[in-house]
Amino acid sequence: MFVYRLELTLHEKVFFASREIDELFQTEPVLGNYALTYALGLAVTPYRLSEREDRPYYREDFSILNDAGIYVTPGTPLGAPALEVERFNGMVESYWYKMANNAVVSDLAVRLDNARAPATNFPQKGRLRMLSRGNRFACYVFAREALMLPRYIRLGKFLGKTHVAVTHEWRDPPTHTARAVQVDAFLNPLDLSAETQLGYYDFFNLPPVPLIRNAQLSGPVYALGDVHLPVGMGFGFPPLETPTRGRGRRRAS
């Protein structure tokens, strides 16, 4: 088993809609492990979904990685995260326009023939709260075989450039059975093995799956320096129609 500790440094602003409140689209200071897996090139999927592919294919993409023994943890911020807010306005400048299917329509055919505009879900104006340049995050990559990881990746809706540095590498790190050990890093509760028992934790309800942090857990763990991470993590899959729920006692964050 190879374990890599990656330090990610943002060279450009990074935005993804963790939470939407009216016209404010917020980026939470955490990098989801699904997004990191795609960005690192470990799973490959088209950037845009076609009309036939109207849902993400997490199960199909990540089942291959589970079979290969590859797993990526969420990215935890190092230090206090820096955020900034920018305003955007995509309203048209034509004399006539109207709202239709959550989009601004200025097409003359729509105006004259009352044709139905294609449905869309792109906001026309609002504010974006983004991660600033210089933010740093740490994540861990597990693999049965050695991996060649890229030095630069693209993250977020606008594909912000991010530097990747492997700061530590372990081969067959030591493990032990812990009881009520504190894990400060972000974890995906769907990815924990059945041998890992959760106590309390901070819960973050983020799409596509919730994450937890500051968790107290018991079970087999890797000893990676002064960091402990659960043994046996693998990609779990959220149900398509029902909400996901974490295990254990939830503590307000």
Where in this protein do the model-derived segments appear?
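Short acidic, gly/pro-rich beta-turn/loop elements at beta-sheet edges
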Residues: S18, S50, L149-R151
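Short, polar loop/linker segments at the starts of domains and inter-domain junctions
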Residues: D22-E28
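Short N-terminal binding/cap micro-motifs at the start of the first secondary-structure element
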Residues: V14-E20
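Extended, compositionally biased
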Residues: E28-A146
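Beta-strand elements of well-folded, non-transmembrane domains
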Residues: L10-V14, A143-E145
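Short amphipathic
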Residues: F2-E12
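Basic polyanion-binding and macromolecular-assembly surfaces
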Residues: R129, G134-S253
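Short linear interaction motifs
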Residues: E20-D22, L112-Q124, E241-T244, R251-A252
